[in-house]
Amino acid sequence: MTINNQPEPTNEQRRIIYQARRGLKELDFYFEPYIKELYLTAEAAEQESFAQMLTHEDPDLLDYFTNQSRPEDDAMWALVNKIKTWRHSKSLS
Protein backbone atom coordinates (compact mmCIF):
# COMPACT_ATOMS: atom_id res chain seq x y z
CA MET A 1 0.00 0.00 0.00
CA THR A 2 1.12 3.51 -0.70
CA ILE A 3 1.03 6.36 1.78
CA ASN A 4 -2.53 7.44 0.97
CA ASN A 5 -3.88 3.90 1.45
CA GLN A 6 -3.98 3.25 -2.28
CA PRO A 7 -2.54 0.01 -3.64
CA GLU A 8 0.68 0.16 -5.62
CA PRO A 9 -0.30 0.69 -9.28
CA THR A 10 0.46 -1.90 -11.92
CA ASN A 11 2.37 -0.88 -15.03
CA GLU A 12 -0.90 -0.63 -16.95
CA GLN A 13 -2.43 1.54 -14.24
CA ARG A 14 0.66 3.75 -14.30
CA ARG A 15 0.18 4.19 -18.05
CA ILE A 16 -3.45 5.22 -17.53
CA ILE A 17 -2.50 7.59 -14.71
CA TYR A 18 0.04 9.22 -17.00
CA GLN A 19 -2.51 9.51 -19.82
CA ALA A 20 -4.95 11.21 -17.45
CA ARG A 21 -2.66 14.24 -17.31
CA ARG A 22 -4.40 16.26 -19.95
CA GLY A 23 -3.09 19.78 -19.44
CA LEU A 24 -6.58 21.18 -19.81
CA LYS A 25 -7.46 22.78 -16.49
CA GLU A 26 -11.15 21.94 -16.78
CA LEU A 27 -10.41 18.23 -17.23
CA ASP A 28 -7.66 18.18 -14.61
CA PHE A 29 -10.25 19.47 -12.12
CA TYR A 30 -11.99 16.11 -12.48
CA PHE A 31 -9.21 13.70 -13.37
CA GLU A 32 -6.49 14.54 -10.83
CA PRO A 33 -8.58 13.95 -7.69
CA TYR A 34 -10.22 10.88 -9.24
CA ILE A 35 -6.82 9.36 -9.98
CA LYS A 36 -5.48 10.19 -6.53
CA GLU A 37 -8.45 8.99 -4.52
CA LEU A 38 -10.62 6.54 -6.45
CA TYR A 39 -9.00 5.05 -9.54
CA LEU A 40 -6.71 2.45 -7.98
CA THR A 41 -9.47 1.02 -5.79
CA ALA A 42 -12.17 1.12 -8.48
CA GLU A 43 -13.62 -2.07 -9.92
CA ALA A 44 -11.89 -3.41 -13.03
CA ALA A 45 -14.88 -2.45 -15.22
CA GLU A 46 -14.69 1.15 -14.00
CA GLN A 47 -10.95 1.26 -14.61
CA GLU A 48 -11.56 -0.01 -18.14
CA SER A 49 -14.22 2.64 -18.74
CA PHE A 50 -11.80 5.29 -17.53
CA ALA A 51 -9.08 3.97 -19.85
CA GLN A 52 -11.57 4.08 -22.74
CA MET A 53 -12.57 7.60 -21.77
CA LEU A 54 -8.95 8.71 -22.08
CA THR A 55 -8.88 7.62 -25.73
CA HIS A 56 -11.28 10.46 -26.53
CA GLU A 57 -10.02 13.86 -27.59
CA ASP A 58 -9.94 16.65 -25.01
CA PRO A 59 -12.68 18.72 -26.70
CA ASP A 60 -14.98 15.69 -26.63
CA LEU A 61 -14.18 15.00 -22.99
CA LEU A 62 -14.85 18.62 -22.13
CA ASP A 63 -18.21 18.36 -23.88
CA TYR A 64 -19.05 15.26 -21.81
CA PHE A 65 -18.16 16.95 -18.54
CA THR A 66 -20.09 20.10 -19.43
CA ASN A 67 -23.14 18.18 -20.70
CA GLN A 68 -22.73 19.49 -24.24
CA SER A 69 -22.72 15.93 -25.55
CA ARG A 70 -22.40 12.41 -24.24
CA PRO A 71 -20.36 9.38 -25.21
CA GLU A 72 -22.14 6.54 -26.96
CA ASP A 73 -20.94 4.07 -24.34
CA ASP A 74 -23.39 4.00 -21.41
CA ALA A 75 -20.77 2.79 -18.93
CA MET A 76 -18.51 5.70 -19.85
CA TRP A 77 -21.39 8.15 -19.50
CA ALA A 78 -22.18 6.70 -16.07
CA LEU A 79 -18.54 7.15 -15.08
CA VAL A 80 -18.50 10.76 -16.30
CA ASN A 81 -21.52 11.45 -14.11
CA LYS A 82 -20.03 9.58 -11.16
CA ILE A 83 -16.81 11.59 -11.37
CA LYS A 84 -18.70 14.88 -11.78
CA THR A 85 -21.02 14.19 -8.85
CA TRP A 86 -18.18 13.02 -6.62
CA ARG A 87 -15.92 15.94 -7.53
CA HIS A 88 -18.58 18.58 -7.06
CA SER A 89 -19.64 17.15 -3.70
CA LYS A 90 -15.98 17.17 -2.68
CA SER A 91 -15.67 20.83 -3.70
CA LEU A 92 -18.55 21.80 -1.45
CA SER A 93 -17.20 20.13 1.67
Swiss-Prot record:
It is found in: Cytoplasm. InterPro entries: SDH, SDH_sf, SdhE_FAD_assembly_factor. The keyword Transmembrane helix does not apply. GO terms for biological process: succinate metabolic process. Its main location: cytoplasm. One of its GO terms (cellular component) is cytoplasm. Pfam families: Sdh5 (PF03937). Keywords: Chaperone, Cytoplasm. SUPFAM superfamilies: YgfY-like. Transmembrane segments: none annotated. It comes from the Bacteria. An FAD assembly protein, which accelerates covalent attachment of the cofactor into other proteins. Plays an essential role in the assembly of succinate dehydrogenase (SDH, respiratory complex II), an enzyme complex that is a component of both the tricarboxylic acid cycle and the electron transport chain, and which couples the oxidation of succinate to fumarate with the reduction of ubiquinone (coenzyme Q) to ubiquinol. Required for flavinylation (covalent attachment of FAD) of the flavoprotein subunit SdhA of SDH and other flavinylated proteins as well. Belongs to the SdhE FAD assembly factor family. This is FAD assembly factor SdhE. The gene is sdhE.
